[in-house]
Regions:
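Conserved phosphate-binding elements of NTP-dependent enzyme cores
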Residues: 1-942
């Protein structure tokens, strides 16, 4: 077997025909500037080739369903093992996917409850019992000695209906008596009951008087009767004492001896909220339901209906629905111009929920010979009809703005039906376990066997061992604060990646090549060592681990480092170093200079004092926040710190930002609960600069996103040649007909379908990839066509447009954020998260600001090298120097040490977090005894 993996002649994206060697069974780190080609080498070359080779083993028919598997542009790769990629971008958005289902811990818990759980009645709380037919006969003969009894089979339990067919069916089977709602009656032809009432119905199978001694004949008769009753009653029978009329239930299934309710035999799917057997029938296992929010339907009750108080209807229009409401209002001596707050509640209820009586619409309005009478279903039903209709996606989207998600009133958010929630082990049902933090669950699992019977222990031992193993893997990757019922869609990229990492460690595979994309994202320095230990564990099992990473601890812990550079984009794509970390420290690459201390991000000599104004957020209680009161001083660089799960994102992204977005932009996103906010008028806008893509189609690019492309097109329109030809700005767009190449639709390439082979993209033979037709390309500025301009890097464009004041600032802003290497027309789908974020920052930088803007950034250092961080922080410092406020959620100490003000959350993650531990200057926070950030900060500030 090869002792190394070798890549020869890699040319994907900006890679310059590079060769690299990776030792087998090693922890290898790929590092380098953002845009240098690390991901191109790791994911687009090594992973893509590994996946392609695996899929080539499938039949041509199977390959047809697996989509595009192009061969990467590489000469050859030797020694390649099966490859598993663990990226950040593949978060599961399905609301039914949770931490428990992803890690399979919940599946093992379902098995544990199905095999070792004890059932209790949801009606009486009694422990459920289960008997064999022989045991039932013994109990009846012992309990009812010398008594006259009826043996009945329950048919209907508390349900509505006339049951005519059921009675006829029983009569034909030869039964003579039936018990309806406690009264025994003779079965007659055509018998029925009130269909609108709930009924309890039992058929009388037999009646007998038991002797006071053991009678073999009587026992045989009773046994046959019990067997018949069990069959007729679906495993449940009822014994009625003739003297006292007291009823007692017996069942072959789990049964409540008091009320007679019976459960099916437990199976794992009864405890699954994704199965009809276990899901809460009201919310279908989601734990939440959509309700129409009246505050969104009528946000301002001081307005009247004519002016548009009912938002779904808008202002008055000459339409039937307004005529109906007018007729309703007339009954209560009101008009369309009466303020909503002055309309009687009974009238508003009819407007919202409908009226039973027919409303009279004047014949003049409907142009008929007589008055028109019509019923009115109400605004709520109107909205529900649109919501539940499959006809119009746009209509559904419109109705969504009036919807609020509320906890299901039936299961109280626990997702399961009441039967599933009635099974317990050590006084806990399965939903209570799913609601625990992983660290709490570990404690429960470690002690649960002490509280089991011998039989339960024998059944549970292996299951508990598997659960414990998986919990330990999650703890190792620093996810102790998550609960099993946490939705996968709410996890950050780093969290979902570490969950998949824990799952992979649990799978115990060997001889596999794992490729991870920055697993340290969102991880506090405290948890970094646990993550590195997990990766080494994966390596020691006999696997090769490649990590694309910028974290200093990870680099120093690696067995092998590959440094890609020297710069980014066209100036990157080369191997500037490959070897052991100790050897790298002796080199002079950009990465080595930061590792050996030749270069560093300097700590400021003095910190800003701000402008004296602030925003105060009081009483935040979303997720795990414990009534947090926090002050954000304006005109400063504020950094929010704390371990993973301590409440940073809840405080900023889920509370502060939605409040401000609602205030400034009427955003529909609702903030998490809080009491009040003060000082909102001290800023004039809020800008959230995240790492989501700037566009999801190949037609989107940095030039279109920043708006500079409109200015460039206008420049070309004003050229003499364009004026002579009468060209308008649309002529220079590749998205509309006129100037674009129609052969390829302005894409610059054509997609050739190859049926059983992957689709092939070839440059358009008419425009040769330039996107425009010949006539458009004949218009030139300084000898360059519009296609040539799009093909320029930002650095080239800055020189080219240096004398064009309306274009230069927008391009210069891209250069200032360190994106000089990307092309103006580069497809946004090829940009990394860090690059997308900096394009957004550049767009904001190029705008004129009032110096009263609040910028919010969540972990902006994701995907950034030390040098990229230095450039990014220079840009953010400039924004603050202009009077703006920059608020960053961050774990990176190079950013934290530059803060003017730190807000530290903690002390732990999940339930043990959610408190404000410290706020103030970095030097002050570094002395806090409770904070996990403090010791690391103190070390770097020395």
């Amino acid at each position: 077997m090869n002792e190394k993996i070798e890549v020869f002649g890699a040319r994907v994206h900006n890679l310059k025909n590079i060769d690299i060697t990776i030792p087998r069974n090693s922890l290898t780190v790929f590092t380098g500037l953002s845009g240098s080609g690390k991901s191109s080498l790791a994911f687009d070359t090594i992973f893509a080739e590994g996946q392609r080779r695996y899929i080539e083993t499938f039949s041509a028919y199977a390959r047809n369903f697996l989509g595009n598997m192009e061969r990467p542009d590489v000469d050859k790769i030797t020694g390649l093992s099966p490859v598993i990629s663990i990226e950040q971008k593949t978060t599961n958005k399905n609301p039914r996917s949770t931490v428990g289902t992803t890690t399979e811990i919940y599946d093992y818990l379902r098995l544990l409850y199905a095999r070792a759980g004890e059932a209790f009645s949801y009606m009486s709380g009694e422990k459920m019992v289960k008997y064999t037919e022989e045991k039932v006969v013994d109990m009846i003969m012992a309990d009812y000695r010398e008594r006259k009894i009826y043996i009945l089979a329950p048919l209907v339990r508390n349900r509505k209906g006339h049951y005519r067919e059921l009675f006829e069916q029983m009569r034909r089977k030869g039964y003579l008596y039936i018990r309806i709602d406690g009264e025994i009656e003779e079965l007659t032809r055509g018998m029925k009951v009130d269909r609108y009432k709930n009924h309890n119905i039992e058929v009388v199978i037999d009646k007998m008087k038991l002797s006071d001694t053991e009678d073999a004949t009587q026992r045989e008769r009773l046994s046959k009767t019990i067997a018949t009753a069990m069959k007729q009653g679906d495993g449940l029978i009822m014994i009625l004492d003739n003297e006292t009329s007291a009823a007692k239930y017996f069942s072959k299934r789990l049964m409540d001896p008091v009320t007679g309710i019976a459960y099916k035999d437990p199976a794992p799917n009864i405890f699954s909220f994704n199965s009809p057997e276990g899901a809460c029938p009201h919310c279908k296992g989601l734990g939440i339901i959509d309700e129409i929010d009246l505050k969104k339907v009528i946000p301002d009750d001081a307005l009247n209906i004519y002016e548009g108080a009912i938002v779904p209807l808008g202002k008055y229009k000459n339409q039937m629905i307004f005529w109906q409401i007018e007729a309703l209002l007339k009954k209560y001596d009101c008009t369309l111009k009466t303020p909503v707050k002055d309309i009687p509640k009974e009238c508003m209820d009819e407007i919202l929920y409908g009226s039973l009586e027919k409303l009279k619409i004047a014949k003049e309005l409907v142009h008929t010979s007589s008055d028109y009478f019509i019923s009115f279903d109400g605004i709520i039903k109107y909205l529900r009809t649109i919501m539940e209709s499959d006809d119009s996606a746009a209509g559904k989207k419109w109705a969504d703005q009036f919807i609020a998600e509320v906890t299901c009133p039936e299961c109280h958010g626990q997702r399961l039906n009441r039967e599933a929630l009635s099974y317990k082990i050590w006084d806990k049902n399965i939903a209570e376990l799913a609601n625990m933090d992983i660290s709490e669950l570990k404690d429960w699992i470690d002690h649960v066997e002490e509280h089991m019977t011998e039989k339960q222990r024998v059944i549970a031992t292996e299951i508990v061992k598997e659960i414990r193993k998986r919990i330990n893997f999650l703890l190792e990757v620093g996810l102790d604060y998550l609960a099993l019922n946490r939705q996968s869609a709410t996890l950050s990229g780093g969290e979902s990646q570490r969950i998949r990492l824990a799952t992979q460690i649990g799978s115990q595979l060997v001889n596999v090549l794992y490729i991870l994309d920055e697993p340290s994202i969102g991880l506090h320095q405290r948890d970094n060592e646990r993550l590195i230990k997990s990766l080494k564990e994966l390596r020691d099992m006999g696997n090769t681990v490649i990590v694309v990473e910028h974290d200093e601890d990870m680099m120093r812990a690696a067995d092998w480092i590959v440094d890609i550079g020297p710069k980014a984009g066209r100036k990157g794509g080369e191997v500037v170093f490959q070897g052991k970390p100790a050897d790298m420290l002796k080199k002079h690459t950009l990465t080595a200079q930061y590792l050996n201390g030749e270069r560093k991000i300097e700590i400021p000599t003095e910190r800003r004092k701000g402008n004296g104004k602030s925003i105060k957020l009081i009483g935040c209680t979303g997720n795990n926040l414990k009534g947090v009161d926090v002050t954000f001083p304006l005109g400063e660089l504020i950094v929010v710190t704390g371990v993973s799960g301590s409440g940073k994102s809840t405080l900023i992204n889920e509370t502060l930002q939605p409040i401000l977005s609602q205030h400034f932009y009427r955003s529909l996103k609702r903030p998490m609960p809080y009491k009040k906010i003060e000082g909102i008028d001290n800023i004039d806008k809020v800008v959230n600069v995240d790492q989501s893509p700037i566009g999801r189609t190949p037609r989107s690019n940095p030039a279109t996103y920043t708006g500079v492309f409109s200015d460039i097109r206008q420049l070309f329109v004003n050229l003499p040649e364009a004026k002579i030809r009468g060209y308008k700005p649309g002529r220079f767009s590749f998205n509309v007909r006129g100037g674009r190449c129609e052969a390829c639709g302005g894409n610059g390439y054509k997609t050739i379908e190859m049926n059983f082979l992957p689709d092939v993209m070839v440059p358009c033979e008419i425009c040769h990839g330039k996107r425009y037709n010949r006539e458009t390309l004949e218009v030139r500025f300084k000898g360059k066509s519009i296609a040539d301009v799009l093909d320029m890097t930002v650095n080239m464009a800055v020189e080219f447009f240096e004398n064009v004041p309306q274009i230069l600032p927008k391009i210069k802003a891209l250069q200032d954020v360190g994106l000089g290497y990307i092309k103006l027309g580069q497809s946004s789908t090829t940009l990394s998260g860090g690059e997308s974020q900096r394009v957004k920052l550049a767009t904001e930088l190029s705008k004129r600001d009032t110096g009263k803007t609040l910028f919010i950034l969540d972990e902006p250092t994701t995907g950034l090298h030390f040098e990229d961080i230095r450039i990014l922080m220079d840009v953010l410092e400039k924004l603050v120097d202009r009077g703006n406020t920059v608020l960053i959620i961050e774990h990176n100490l190079d950013v934290i040490k530059l803060a003017d003000y730190i807000i530290d959350m903690g002390p732990e993650g999940g339930r043990n977090g959610g408190r404000l531990l410290a706020a103030g200057l970095p030097e002050v926070v570094a002395k806090n005894k409770e904070s996990h950030t403090a010791p690391f900060l103190a070390k770097i500030l020395k």
